[in-house]
Amino acid sequence: YNIKNLILPLSIFLIGLLDLIWYSAFKVDNSPFRATYHSYLNTAKIFIFGSFIVFLTLTSQLKSKKESVLYTLYSLSFLIAGYAMYINSIHENDRISFGVGTATGAAYSTMLIGIVSGVAILYTKKNHPFLFLLNSCAVLYVLALTQTRATLLLFPIICVAALIAYYNKSPKKFTSSIVLLIAILASIVIIFNKPIQNRYNEALNDLNSYTNANSVTSLGARLAMYEIGLNIFIKSPFSFRSAESRAESMNLLVAEHNRLRGALEFSNVHLHNEIIEAGSLKGLMGIFSTLFLYFSLFYIAYKKRALGLLILTLGIVGIGLSDVIIWARSIPIIIISAIVLLLVINNRNNTIN
């Protein structure tokens, strides 16, 4: 087998293995951090199993020959948008979560599925940018209903990256698609002006509170978690530590610096940044495993000229800057499934020249 086909499965397997080792080393009965341990155990199972599926996909000649499969994937965003519209008609003005978790989690899942859905149409014979942007419109509609700031900022950037990668040799199509994307974004802003404005004002208030030593806000708590997580890592960069040990360190730091108290609410969850979370629990090995995964995704996307995998990777890395998605069950399943689907789709033809 070509060595390049081992890099991505190995990076996925490494994360799963480290999570399993960490769980086995520190999980005890009746732990107050049971949810945290089981979230990592679920990720370990999914990534270890998923690494073999990804390896088989990379080393096989499996192709998606029928375009009907691509159109089925393309329809996913519209099905999600339709369901979101129905939920919104019942619970108007609430952040939608599809009843399966948080609104933020729903946004991340929708964006990752939307990337697969949008990229699928670019591999068909009717790969007009209008169809891609129609998908983007459906995804942005759902993201606006979740009112998740990170995805509302990140997804348009991903759309632009996809258009540049796919239509860079067709200036006319590229220009018209960018103009249409701007029009779609403007429409979303106009339609959802009130909730977007509210979330924007909340962000400004959160930042203002944080500068005034109050981190008990959404953004303030994130910034406090980043500071605490880095502090914990720097004190012992080569060590694994339990969830209990990390929480104890968080409490000690807050006792010294009360302005960081907003982070304590999430001591039994995660630190809302992939690198900081990995470093705070698994030290340098945790950070290396996360960066290795990112590198492997970009590397395979480049080597296989896989537009879809490149765009998905941008989404995974982008979300990882402000949250943790390599965690728990649902989103890791989506990530592994998306990688496999995009690799299979890419076997039809190459799209990055």
Predicted features, each with a name:
Residues 312-317, 326-353:
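Transmembrane alpha-helices of multi-pass inner-membrane enzymes
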Residues 21-32, 85-94:
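Juxtamembrane "helix-exit" motif on the non-cytosolic side of transmembrane helices
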Residues 1-26, 57-67, 71, 121-130, ...:
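Transmembrane signal-anchor hairpin modules in multi-pass inner-membrane enzymes, especially those
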Residues 216-220, 224-227, 234-235, 241-282:
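Long extracytoplasmic/lumenal interhelical loops at the membrane interface
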Residues 173-176, 280-314:
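Hydrophobic transmembrane alpha-helices and their immediate junctions
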Residues 166-212, 230-234:
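A membrane-periplasm/extracellular boundary helix in multi-pass inner-membrane enzymes
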Residues 7-23, 30-57, 68-72, 77, ...:
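Aromatic-anchored transmembrane helix interface
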Residues 49-92, 103-168, 191:
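Alpha-helical transmembrane segments of multi-pass inner-membrane proteins
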